[in-house]
Amino acid sequence: MSLIGGGSDCAAGSNPLAQFTKHTQHDTSLQQSMRNGEFQQGNQRMMRNESTMSPMERQQMDQFMQQQNNPAFNFQPMQHELNVMQQNMNAPQQVANNSWNQEFRMKDPMVANAPSAQVQTPVQSTNWAQDFQQAGPEVQHHAQQHQHPILSVPGVRAGIYGGGRLMGGSMMNRAAQMQQQNPAQAQTSEQSQTQWEDQFKDIESMLNSKTQEPKTKQQEQNTFEQVWDDIQVSYADVELTNDQFQAQWEKDFAQYAEGRLNYGEYKYEEKNQFRNDPDAYEIGMRLMESGAKLSEAGLAFEAAVQQDPKHVDAWLKLGEVQTQNEKESDGIAALEKCLELDPTNLAALMTLAISYINDGYDNAAYATLERWIETKYPDIASRARSSNPDLDGGDRIEQNKRVTELFMKAAQLSPDVASMDADVQTGLGVLFYSMEEFDKTIDCFKAAIEVEPDKALNWNRLGAALANYNKPEEAVEAYSRALQLNPNFVRARYNLGVSFINMGRYKEAVEHLLTGISLHEVEGVDASEMSSNQGLQNNALVETLKRAFLGMNRRDLVDKVYPGMGLAQFRKMFDF
């Protein structure tokens, strides 16, 4: 009973144990809030149990409360001892923490300006809330910004993005040792540690210099050998003769020529009224001069090359006629045969390059245009080969740039219209056309027209450039001019028909396309008797005619369109 005490000694103001408990538990709101439910349940249980106390128990409790003379237990010595123990524990730890924190900031500049992360002891935490309120709004704002301290500790970021010094075990062990030292010993140890680290860095630097010295000599030797090898290669390139440059160019040209479709041998028409005529070539020339159908002139030239397979001019004219007659494959096969017999034929080279562009074989076209420059302007080509004998590894853009520069140099030789080379302007226009630089293409083709205004081919090329440049009205004018100069120019009619379709003028498109197909007919030969090769060559015209009928909503006429069809059925509806 004496251990419990009695009377007023149980009050908090006079009970030393109660005062000690208040002192060490200044702010326990966080812990209490976590146990709030349990605390309330305990009170409820106490209130329920109070009504069940027996009369005997109540009498004993009254007797206990009436004891006034029993001395209370003296807690003053215990409180004094506890205070001494607490001060002895906190003071060295705080000194050690402050000393290590200051030393660490001096060693690491990344945390030199960081806020101190001090350990809060029970004594410090007693007045923390009061100190925080007195610190002012700046400190409170700073604390609010660090609600997620793991993202704002400089040491953590350095470990992730920097050298990771806080991740090493030696630093942690050193901190543990300094907690056991007094401030003077910590300072002495720090000075010794700093001197030792400086000496270690000096030794390490000296060893690294010794290790890197052989590498430096080896690198100098390797660099010298590389420079010497480069000199030898450059000297070998300079020693190449013009014949060797020519051989290299021929090799590259063959490479690009092999990259396009192999058109094979020329396929002749089975029915040809000129086959046994000894003057087939002259007949073909007269037909072209008189404005006859290109198909008839083509048959005459076919007969000429069949009679004399080495007739270069006949192969050239056959190729030109077939390309103008919208028979690209036959035209390319004839032109390639012409160049096989005469590799320097300028007309064949230019026409073949344009045909390659039409069929999408750009690199083959560039190589052919370079051959054209090499033939007509050998000085320009020779200087270009000396600086770069390759055709630049098949890169389409670089190859176009290289050949364009050659043609630009050739154009600079005769800037005046009176002395201008129309073929140079045509070649430049083709190069720009392949890169879809249609504004430059138009300028080049217009320049060629200034030199040769009566050449239907120039007007047709200008029309194609204008159409691709989204100028259909001007394109129609150019195509119309080409047809005025050569009414049997099938390609110009085909292009004109396409332009009318794009403009929504379907009836006019149909009439020009039907005219083009009719120009493929040969007098005395039924369309159904034409060879399969002839029918395939009409395919572009036929398919475009179907599109025009669909635009007119004449599906009844679409089924009547096929290669070798009779054209009489359309003459009552269309003027051609």
Swiss-Prot record:
Claim: Kinase is one of the keywords in the record: no
Gene3D superfamilies linked to this entry: Tetratricopeptide repeat domain (1.25.40.10)
One GO-annotated biological process of the protein: protein import into peroxisome matrix, docking
Region (Disordered): 176-195
Keywords: Cytoplasm, Disulfide bond, Isopeptide bond, Membrane, Peroxisome, Protein transport, Repeat, Thioester bond, TPR repeat, Translocation, Transport, Ubl conjugation
Cross-link type Glycyl lysine isopeptide (Lys-Gly) (interchain with G-Cter in ubiquitin), residue numbers: K22
Cross-link (Glycyl cysteine thioester (Cys-Gly) (interchain with G-Cter in ubiquitin)): C10
UniProt PTM: A disulfide bond is created between Cys-10 and Cys-338 or Cys-444.
Described purpose of this protein according to its UniProt entry: Receptor that mediates peroxisomal import of proteins containing a C-terminal PTS1-type tripeptide peroxisomal targeting signal (SKL-type). Binds to cargo proteins containing a PTS1 peroxisomal targeting signal in the cytosol, and translocates them into the peroxisome matrix by passing through the peroxisomal docking complex along with cargo proteins. PEX5 receptor is then retrotranslocated into the cytosol, leading to release of bound cargo in the peroxisome matrix, and reset for a subsequent peroxisome import cycle. Required for PEX7 ubiquitination.
Name this protein carries in UniProt: Peroxisomal targeting signal receptor
Species of provenance: Komagataella phaffii (strain GS115 / ATCC 20864)
